[in-house]
Regions:
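Outer-membrane beta-barrel biogenesis signature
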Residues: 20-73, 149-150, 154-156
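Extracellular loop and loop/strand-boundary signature of outer-membrane beta-barrel proteins
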Residues: 38, 75-79, 122-129, 178-183, ...
Length: 320
């Protein structure tokens, strides 16, 4: 069987933009999106917590090769991918230790349904996986640089680890173990390093930010190493009223090929750029609701992979 899913999004944690985040290969369909206040020009006080609950819907149902969409008839491999539906719930808790230091823990729950046809030119077999599992946890630190000459500018470094807390041996009802790229966890420990910069915009009470993040597996299990990732997010926040803000982001992701005996390097890795318009509503000073739509504006996939035409994100953030 060949798993060929596009990286519609990649995982993230709050300090990063997602999952992870982020913060996520085929098993990492998370949105590359920044919903963290600290990189959008909204400061957090020392000793405060930030809890973020974020839902993502990512429906991968179109085959692409390179930059072109293809039909199932054009797919001559030994497996024809049909569809992967991802419903992710990402919970992130941040703690601001001081004016310079903060820590973050992010845990995803992955609800994934995938189907394909094995050996489509022979004894075709329909196979499907449905599971809801905890994914890989990210533990991150953030250091904010002092800037006494220009205190409205916010800049810093992010660093930490993605830990192998997610299962990587999930099987379907027939006992067939899903391939590693489909699993809720990669089985790897990854090092994460990034930086951010935010400053006031050209309009009153607006702001802009740029954020970069690099992730690489440093410890792996059972002959599978996920490809290195680099993501770059640029965004502008503009107030539409006292409580409502518009946010427009450009999110890019470069994902290297997976490697190892249980990987498929020819069918993994991609380069993607997304346009992400959204709205943020402040219920109170410390409680926000947000929603975004993520639209691909450039995609290139190694081999044949499932891709997504749009993704949806909605969530709530509270500081206390």
């Amino acid at each position: 069987m060949n798993k060929r899913f596009a990286i519609a999004c990649s995982g993230g944690a709050a300090l990063l933009a997602a999952a992870g985040a982020a913060q996520g290969s085929c098993g990492s369909a998370f949105c590359v999106l920044n919903t963290n206040w600290s990189t959008q020009g909204v400061a957090s006080d020392p000793g405060s917590f930030r809890l973020d609950e974020r839902f993502e819907f990512v429906d991968q149902k179109h085959l692409m090769q390179g930059t072109k969409r293809i039909s199932q008839a054009d797919d001559t491999a030994d497996t024809t991918e049909l569809r992967t539906i991802n419903r992710n719930l990402l919970t992130t808790l941040d703690y601001t230790v001081s004016k310079n230091w903060a820590v973050s823990v992010s845990v995803p729950v992955v609800d994934r349904s995938h189907s394909h046809i094995a050996n489509p030119t022979g004894a075709a077999t329909f196979e499907k996986w449905d599971f809801t599992k905890v994914g890989d946890t990210r533990v991150l630190g953030m250091y904010r640089f002092d800037n006494e000459k220009n205190p409205v500018v916010n800049q810093g470094l992010m660093f930490g680890l993605k830990l192998p807390t997610g299962d990587y041996r999930v099987s379907n009802a027939d006992g067939s173990v899903a391939e590693r790229a489909l699993q809720p966890g990669t089985g790897s420990t990854d090092f994460v390093l990034g930086g951010y910069y935010s400053a006031p915009g050209i309009h009153l009470d607006s702001s802009w930010f740029v954020q970069g993040l690099y992730q690489q597996a440093v410890s792996t299990k059972e002959e599978y190493k996920p490809g290195n990732q680099f993501q770059l997010n640029v965004g502008y926040r503009y107030p539409l009223g006292h409580d409502l803000q518009a946010l427009l982001q450009i999110n890019s992701l470069i994902k290297g090929r997976d490697s190892g005996a249980n990987a498929e390097p020819d069918l993994s890795g991609s380069k993607s750029v997304f346009l992400s318009p959204g709205l943020i509503y402040s219920v109170t000073h410390d409680f926000q609701l947000y929603s975004f739509v993520q639209l691909p504006i450039y995609r290139f996939y190694n081999g044949i992979q499932l891709s997504v035409d749009w993704a949806f994100v909605a969530g709530a953030t509270v500081r206390f």
